Amino acid sequence: MLNKQNKLYLQAQAYWDFLRIEKQVSPHTLTNYQRQLLAISEMLIAAQIDDWQAVDASVVRWILTQSHKQGLGAKSIGLRLVVLRQWFAYLVQRHYVKVNPAVGIKAPKVARHLPKNIDAERMGQLLDVEVDEPADIRDLAMMELMYSSGLRLAELQRLDLGDMDLIDAEVRLLGKGNKERIVPIGSRALTALQAWLTVRPSFNPQDNALFLNKRGGRLSHRSIQLAMQKWGERQGLATRLHPHKLRHSFATHLLEASTDLRAVQELLGHSSLSTTQIYTHLDFQHLAKIYDASHPRARRKRED
């Protein structure tokens, strides 16, 4: 690997501040962009291209071809193209280059492999567990909330206490692109969250993060993944339990029971459906009605 102190990579230093401050990308996204642009700059330096102004569409295609030869899959090559496109958009904006050479170049198609969902009966066995240890109470609350409301891992990880409305059984989420949405919380998840909030002070909280590690700080993405993996192993789950499997199961179970596809899609926070939502606006009351009628662990309303 070439030293990071190469001319091409050094030119991107101000770009990292732009992404972090103006675009407010997550640390994970920033690290990915840095890793990709470093790999690209090393590839160009090795080809004796030492100025971004020398990169045209043919060079971009060469980068993608070389990436394939290095063993990168379609998804990774697609990410590399996205990084290039965004980087050159920044350079155009700063008047360093006149055109974006990555525009119009298509990424390789990625075969979509959705994780297998856990059926509703097995999900019940996974979550209907008596817990006493504070860490287990926390982990159960995380899983109930993810399955109850279809959260992404990043959405769960960044939750603060103020994002929860336990009276109205709602949670405010900040999704991809900093897009906010409000989703309902099912009764089982609500009970699990209340149990967690009872023992949360024993973790000596250092901030307002909803889910804490043993030092009182916010749980990391990796810690959440490991906690769920260990939970699945303890409950005898045949396949690895990871956060997205809970989100996928949430979507699958709702779609199996509901005839309103758009409601489920809005609950998931899929930005790609914005065009459809122009024609059919779904308010929260409607989403909550679909949720209550469809989710196997919802039943938020008490029967008098």
From Swiss-Prot:
Gene Ontology molecular functions: DNA binding; tyrosine-based site-specific recombinase activity
Coiled coil: none
Active site (record annotation): 152, 176, 244, 247, 270, 279 (o-(3'-phospho-dna)-tyrosine intermediate)
Location of the Core-binding (CB) domain: 6-92
Superkingdom: Bacteria
Keyword Cytoplasm: yes
Keywords per UniProt: Cell cycle, Cell division, Chromosome partition, Cytoplasm, DNA integration, DNA recombination, DNA-binding
Residues in Tyr recombinase domain copies: 113-292
A single BP term in Gene Ontology: cell division
InterPro entries according to UniProt: CB, DNA_brk_join_enz, Integrase-like_cat_sf, Integrase_catalytic, Integrase_recombinase_N, Integrase_SAM-like_N, Recomb_XerC, Tyrosine_recombinase_XerC/XerD
UniProt key word Cell division: yes
Localisation: Cytoplasm
Gene3D superfamilies: 1.10.150.130, Intergrase catalytic core
Entry GO CC: cytoplasm
Binding partners and assembly: Forms a cyclic heterotetrameric complex composed of two molecules of XerC and two molecules of XerD.
Family annotation (HAMAP family): Recomb_XerC_XerD (MF_01808)
Role: Site-specific tyrosine recombinase, which acts by catalyzing the cutting and rejoining of the recombining DNA molecules. The XerC-XerD complex is essential to convert dimers of the bacterial chromosome into monomers to permit their segregation at cell division. It also contributes to the segregational stability of plasmids.
Protein family per UniProt: Belongs to the 'phage' integrase family. XerC subfamily.
Protein name as it appears in the record: Tyrosine recombinase XerC
Top-level taxonomy: Bacteria, Pseudomonadati, Pseudomonadota, Gammaproteobacteria, Pasteurellales
Gene (name only): xerC
